[in-house]
Amino acid sequence: MALAGKQYEGSLNNSRPNLWPSSIPGGKNEIITSLVTALDSMCTALSKLNTEVACIALHEESAFVVGTEKGRCFLNSRKELQADFQRFCIGAHKKDQENEVKRRNRDGIQNIQHVPLGPTSDIYLLRKMVEEIFEVLYSEALGKSNIVPVPYVKVMKEPGSVVVLGLPDGISFRKPAEYDLKSLMLILKHSHNIRFKLRIPTEESIREPKSCSELNSPPTSATKVIPETSQCHRLPIQEHPSSASNFPYSVSQPNQISLEPKQEVHSNMLGTNAVNQMLVQRPSAENNHDLSDCCGQQSPVAGSSLRQNVLASKHLLFSIVHDKTDKWDSFLRETEDINILRECVQILFNSRYAGALGLDHMVPVPYRKIACHPEAVEINGFPDKIPFKRPCTYGVPKLKRILEERHNIHFTIKSMFDQRIFDGTTFTKETTKSDSSSLGEEACSENQKAAALDMLGFPTGSRSEKSSISDECEPGTSSETTGVKLIKLEAEDPDIMQIAVPGTSSETSGVKIIKLESEDPDLIQITVPGTSNETSGVKPKLESEDPDLIQIAVPDRLAECVKNHLAPEDPSYVLDTGKVCDDRPCGVLRNENKHLDGIGDIIRQLRKHVENLFNRKYAKAIGASGPVKVPYAKFLMYPEDLFVLGLPEGVAFRRPNCFGITKLRRILEYSDGIQFVVKRPELISEGLEDCVVGSPGTLGFNDKSNEVILDETNTRPSFQESFDARLSRIDIANTLREQVQVLFNKKYGEALGIKYPVQVPYKRIKNNPGSVIIEGLPPGIPFRKPCTFGSQNLERILAVADKIRFTVTRPFQGLIPRPDDEDANRLGEKVILREQVKELFNEKYGKALGLDQPALIPYKLIRDNPDAVEVRGMPNDIPFRNPNSYDLHRLENILKAQDQIQMVVIKQLEPFPEICSEPPKIKNGNTGPKRKRKRVSEGNSISSASSNCSSSSSSSSNMDPISSAHHVSLVQWPMYMLDYGGLNMQLPGPINY
């Protein structure tokens, strides 16, 4: 929650609530409570540093006692201090009020409240805003799309040349530097009524803006200001398209413009808070369609008129950020409004990133891509110890530090993310502006052509953001664009472009065949039947580097189906702003079997190609004749023995479902050099044997069409695919957490000079800040337990594993393990032994069930029914339970006695009495997995933290190898791992419990 500005007067009185903006959610009391709570948190943090704080906060009649424990005891035991402080503040304020009343009586000002003067930077800000408003309005009167400075000297010498309409009563037009604070505030409040009109037409003036708001402003007394009439006419929006769209940053026209005198007087008291509120508030987009309602009543909400005063706020913030002088430094240092600061930092980042790309307009920064590929963009001049993130994640202190270094911050692009940013396609939110547009033609045809040119990446004089394709596009006038669809283009004749216009008439609803002009290959003419000559032709010039990408826009009332002149095997896409035609007049042009609906189909096709590529390469590595499904879990579990060579730089081996379009295409480009390496064939020997003998467990074969992998899951219901997918995601996340845990332990052991990995004492490091320095982590990722990270951050950590380094600056208790404690030094060995014991138990349990393959043990069911399964041959004093709870010595003893261990199923565990005897019959059922509940380790206390974080990972790490290599029947999964909510089937035969 951000405070709207700095108070100019530190006194407390009954009029102070007016200085707080009423639009802040929750009101002033909630803000004060929140700030006092934050102050109390700071005192608590200071107490941890052996610092005592005592603080008294006074607001009107309420007093808050904040501080450390000793500080609060001190203040509570001395109530006279609070009373003295309260009398001091109230007495001083009353004295100031009396002096103010006397001064007002002397000056003869009885009913007008005094406006406190703020710092010099604040009056500069108001004058700058007024100057920006005058320049924008003057440029609009000239018909210019760019900003033209107002010739104040010429206007003063020739009063009749320029007429200013809508200025507040008693204020004449002059230079903004000559206005006082009160006049500036009134001008800003009535900025939506102000209009410039050229009395003497110049060569530059083309047309005069017409707006209904000209007719509803109070009359003025100045000679250069013409009073406006009180009548209001309803005008359609199309008659003045530039009045609302040519303003910088698309400021909406207000629909409530009448003001009451009382509201005008009270709003003059807002000072810097009003300035900050004007910079922060944005008019809602819903007001855009209400332009015709000029005579609406003023909203009773206080401060609602201030929401209309954002005409040039973003333009002004851009000037503040890029001003080389120190004129705005004091304003940036003094303001406490986090929204203004974040907006400034956002403008700074976007402009610097655009400058690095060589563009002359701001471009949104791809924060997520930069976070995933920090080596692609180098950021110079950034403040120390501040990571580069989205501005919305910074607080006020960091935002101010960034703005202090704004002139030194520069971006350097080392590798590009997406070339489409230069193509002017739908993925750029800010497009280039041009000053060469003309406003003299018909508004309707001009708007339609401008929309078409904007979609093709052409800059136009009108607001390019109105025509840029985005997710927020809504149907509107012809100058706006509707929803966008991607259509696959196919044409038998490359010289013919086929265009279908459904719904225009019975004669033109079919397909129009147009011959492409061969004289200029860069010009394509599209003729829409049934329209006028002014709107039927669109001749866009293709500036995109990709000649296969064509963007076409037509009026909103027409639906278009466009076919491009490309070969069928090279699919490309065109933007279709029309609706899907259910009548199917253009369905003849489409091949329904090859139709691609959008990006989702593209990425699915790419993932299928990469999946087939991996299966072929894996089959080649193991000597199989056909494609074999890759056991991804095995490769993630044993990265030193199973790995892949030849992948593109920065791309780790994972399932194709984890990649995006960019990485999938890069993998396909490097397909010839990709090679699977298997150092330990015994890890995949079971799957290899199945492939060699061609058993039902065979994972795939070569299809003639596109080598699609067919396995047992293709004959199963769809729930099994979802089942395996969910298990694979859980297994991937748990495996990544375990790998990061091992990485941290290894790096921590190296920092201590110990041969083996050492368990990282996360809590002790947190309680002793500065004792251990961790370097090399990706930007924006703090150091904490791996079990608290998601898969994306875990992958980013593993990608920079070589750069991560631990440095111990000062020792503390528990930093170095005891020399006689071998378990702490053999933590990595414990993880391996635990997995071996799990595999041993699963194998023994599978034999006890009469199966020829391992089965996952339902430890929870066995614990609840200890008489159901008997385990023989266990070492002395070692009970049978989940291996996660064993310490290192017990794991070693179990492995030594593995030949003597046997399991005997005395009675079947519910609900599997009859099902287990006939596993092949049960193949159907809508079941889904649930993650196992974590249980606290009962083993060694030193490695308890590791066991807790990896209990679920180790328990589920066996699932994917079993399901992928053998496809264990669902009857072998324990009951608590299944969800029977969607099960709707009949079991074969009666069940005897």
Curated annotation (Swiss-Prot):
Its main location: nucleus. A motif (Nuclear localization signal) lies at residues 929-936. This is General transcription factor II-I repeat domain-containing protein 1. Transcription factor that activates a subset of organizer-specific genes. Binds to the distal element (DE) of the gsc promoter to regulate its expression. In the presence of pou5f1.1/oct-25, forms a repression complex on the promoter of the gsc and mix2 genes to inhibit their transcription. InterPro entries: GTF2I, GTF2I-like_rpt_sf, TF_II-I. Interacts (via repeats 4-5) with foxh1/fast1 (via Fork-head domain). Interacts with smad2 and smad3 (via MH1 domain) in a ligand (activin)-dependent manner. Interacts with pou5f1.1/oct-25 to form a repression complex on the promoters of the gsc and mix2 genes. It is found in: Nucleus. GO terms for biological process: negative regulation of DNA-templated transcription; negative regulation of transcription by RNA polymerase II; positive regulation of DNA-templated transcription; positive regulation of transcription by RNA polymerase II; regulation of activin receptor signaling pathway; transcription by RNA polymerase II. Belongs to the TFII-I family. Keywords: Activator, Developmental protein, DNA-binding, Nucleus, Repeat, Repressor, Transcription, Transcription regulation. It comes from the Eukaryota. GO terms for molecular function: DNA-binding transcription factor activity; DNA-binding transcription factor binding; RNA polymerase II-specific DNA-binding transcription factor binding; SMAD binding; transcription cis-regulatory region binding. GTF2I-like repeats lie at residues 117-211, 332-426, 597-691, 727-821, 824-918. Residues 938-961 have a biased composition (Low complexity). Pfam families: GTF2I. Residues 461-480, 916-961 are annotated as: Disordered. PANTHER family: GENERAL TRANSCRIPTION FACTOR II-I REPEAT DOMAIN-CONTAINING PROTEIN 1. Uniformly expressed in the embryo in pre- and early gastrula stages. Enriched in the head region of early neurula through tailbud stages. GO terms for cellular component: nucleus; transcription regulator complex. PROSITE patterns: GTF2I.
